[in-house]
Design a protein with these regions (language model features):
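C-terminal regulatory/interaction module of P-loop NTP-utilizing enzymes
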Residues: 1-330
Length: 331
């Protein structure tokens, strides 16, 4: 101690070896750590192209696949359940017209008060050796062209941090779309775009996903009913027949709308909630214009002739049509 009794304050020394240099690695934020294996979907029925895609997933090879088909026929669900069964991680990215390189490959973000480069979902999938799912791919713009080297199975150079990313073994790309990347001529899928031919050419195969057969669809509907706790096999039969007739009419150009497998699942859930067949159907087809809605309802009453007399529910459900202004009750 000094003679005056006051302790000297000594500045701490800094070990030169502990100083962190500003390197590329220091600019990059940590990757995701959670498990990305999809959850198993109760009541899922494997059908159609499931076995083909299963072989691709199990091969662990890089083999980009483009899956196309009408809305609500299980394209995305099938891919997710394949990975759930294989216990393989999957990153699903929903594509929109606004999706760009920053969204896909990554960009600078504020992380704990510091500016860090946060890898995008494409980079995460490449570095982890897992599957990247580009959902609703045909809604994207030409900004998707940043994925060209990725779809070739090669690495990609991150220009923002001067870093080369090489895909780990097991990395693959799946894409789903309502069109084949040629746009929607009939306007059913407004917002879809014509994708670059060079982009499409990089997908090894294209899988065309139809709606399931009547036998398969009945299993799907019964599975939904069981999941929601309200099983009625006769109702399931009638719903599948009804949807099949509407689809045939749609393909022949007789109607502009179609009943999807997803909509049948919605009806099964509505039936479990309201306990009334016609209420469930009417609520789930109310999104169509009045003429289409009434024709679909009328068709169902012809398929299930006694539905209006036999339907019963403890409560009366009032359904108001915003187009016609009419109010009707379902007993």
């Amino acid at each position: 101690l000094p003679s005056d009794g006051v302790e000297k304050v000594v500045a701490p020394t800094v070990d030169s070896e502990s100083v962190v240099e500003e390197t590329t690695m220091n600019l990059v934020a940590n990757s995701l750590i959670e498990n990305l294996v999809p959850s198993k979907f109760e009541g899922f029925v494997a059908w159609g192209n499931y076995s083909i895609l299963k072989k691709i997933v199990n091969s662990n090879m890089f083999y980009p696949v483009f899956v196309t088909g009408l809305s609500g026929n299980g394209k995305t669900l099938m891919i997710e359940q394949l990975h759930a069964e294989a216990k393989k991680e999957l990153i699903r990215v929903n594509i929109t017209i606004e999706t760009d390189e920053d969204d896909l490959l990554g960009g600078f973000r504020l992380v704990n008060g510091e500016t860090k480069f946060v890898p995008g979902p494409v980079i995460e999938a490449m570095e982890r050796g897992i599957t990247l799912l580009l959902d609703e791919c045909d809604l994207g713009s030409n900004k998707l062209m940043c994925l060209q080297p990725v779809l070739e199975g090669n690495g990609v150079f991150l220009k923002k941090v001067n870093k080369w990313i090489k895909p780990k073994e097991g990395f693959n790309v799946f894409a789903t779309a309502n069109t084949k990347g040629k746009g929607s001529e009939d306007g059913r899928f407004i917002g879809t775009n014509i994708l670059n031919e060079a982009f499409l050419e990089r997908f090894a195969i294209t899988i065309e996903q139809p709606y399931p057969t009547a036998a398969i669809e009945k299993k799907i509907v019964l599975g939904s009913m069981e999941k929601y706790g309200s099983v009625d096999e006769k109702f399931a039969d009638n719903l599948v027949t009804w949807a099949e007739v509407i689809r045939k009419t749609f393909y022949d150009g007789g109607v502009d709308e179609v009943i999807s497998t997803r909509r049948l699942d919605h009806i099964a859930k509505a039936f479990a909630i309201f306990g009334n067949k016609m209420t469930a159907i009417e609520l789930c087809v109310a999104r169509f214009d009045d003429d289409t809605k009434e024709s679909f309802l009328d068709l169902y009453t012809k398929i299930d002739a006694g539905v209006l007399e036999n339907d019963s529910d403890e409560d009366t459900v009032e359904i108001v049509s915003t187009e016609s202004g009419e109010t009707r009750s379902e007993e």
